[in-house]
């Protein structure tokens, strides 16, 4: 199964913010126990690179990627640490070009036709749509998908257990991203059983 197939199969790509490296593996295992075996560890905190390494080395069943990547240096470091895919909040010609050149799956943030056309130039077929609830949600993605046949979206922002099925049922959605299945407060408190249940609930709601 390819990385893109794994992301679609997981349905949810948790956006994980970690303050401590030692929380990485328990978080990954808790989500995997809930049926979510992918995770996007964001580069919003200093421990992100080592957290990615920890998951890559200790949780082979989990597909770990790096999020909030805004330059090539971060992308290179993330991949060196074991990230299997890259997610960026916006479109960076340099980041996308480096990922394509190195055969690393990448989902750049694109919310306008111009950004999507720049992404398509690199042969990509999936974009991050962020923040989805600000830029028009499903209706916006539906309209954007009309001229860009075959394009898939990874929406993040405003997706939750209450509306995940509506998103996943749309033919132009590849998977959804979000942090609601792995709240930062629950990670910090070690509420692993709660995180497992949140993942189970989200997957059940998507069916």
List each model region and its residues:
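Mobile acidic interaction elements
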Residues: 29, 34, 121, 128-129, ...
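CoA-thioester-processing core
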Residues: 99, 106, 137-148, 155
């Amino acid at each position: 199964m390819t990385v893109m197939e794994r992301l679609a199969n997981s349905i949810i790509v948790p956006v994980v913010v970690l303050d401590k490296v030692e929380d990485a593996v328990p978080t990954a295992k808790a989500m995997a126990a809930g049926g979510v075996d992918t995770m996007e560890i964001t580069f919003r905190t200093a421990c992100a690179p080592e957290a990615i390494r920890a998951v890559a080395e200790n949780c082979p069943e989990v597909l770990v990627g790096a999020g909030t990547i805004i330059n090539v240096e971060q992308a290179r470091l993330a991949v060196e640490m074991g990230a299997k895919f890259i997610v960026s909040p916006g479109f960076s010609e340099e980041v996308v070009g480096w990922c394509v050149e190195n055969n690393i799956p990448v989902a750049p943030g694109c919310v306008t036709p111009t950004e999507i056309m720049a992404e398509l130039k690199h042969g990509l077929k999936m974009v991050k749509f962020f923040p989805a609830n600000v830029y028009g949600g499903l209706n916006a993605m539906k309209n954007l998908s009309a001229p860009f046949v075959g394009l898939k979206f990874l929406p993040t922002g405003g997706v939750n257990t209450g509306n995940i099925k509506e998103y996943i049922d749309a033919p132009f959605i590849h998977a959804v991203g979000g942090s609601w299945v792995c709240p930062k407060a629950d990670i910090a408190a070690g509420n692993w059983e709660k995180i497992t249940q949140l993942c189970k609930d989200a997957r059940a709601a998507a069916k």
